[in-house]
Amino acid sequence: MKSLYVAFGGALGAVSRYVISKFINSSFSFSFVPWGTIFVNVVGSFLLSFLMFLSISKTDISQSFILFFGTGFLGAFTTFSTFAYEFLSIFLTQPLRAIIYFIANIFLGFFAAILGMFLGRGRIL
């Protein structure tokens, strides 16, 4: 049963990532970087960190929900492989732009995860 929670969450997360990323990238086709990938990675980093730190302080969050939403949905919603591919594709022709994309993705993702940790714990420090 646990595998089904992950599978269903993963299916929804993958489709959500595809739709959101395509919408954002087509809305900002003139953009300097692929904002769709940055968006899903940053939002996913925040939500997963928030969920996991909240689950530490609140024992009433079910393991089934964590498997469905954390492991399944957010695991498929975020995408390291697309980030790596896009970075390398950009790097081949525009190395400086690729490095900016890399730094933005990592920095914003970790910032979002730290914010999620603080909010999930319910306190700043």
From Swiss-Prot:
It is found in: Cell inner membrane. Na(+) is not transported, but it plays an essential structural role and its presence is essential for fluoride channel function. The chain crosses the membrane at residues 36-56, 65-85, 99-119. Disulfide bonds: none annotated. Keywords: Cell inner membrane, Cell membrane, Ion channel, Ion transport, Membrane, Metal-binding, Sodium, Transmembrane, Transmembrane helix, Transport. Coiled coil: none annotated. GO terms for cellular component: plasma membrane. It comes from the Bacteria. HAMAP family: FluC. Belongs to the fluoride channel Fluc/FEX (TC 1.A.43) family. This is Fluoride-specific ion channel FluC. The gene is fluC.
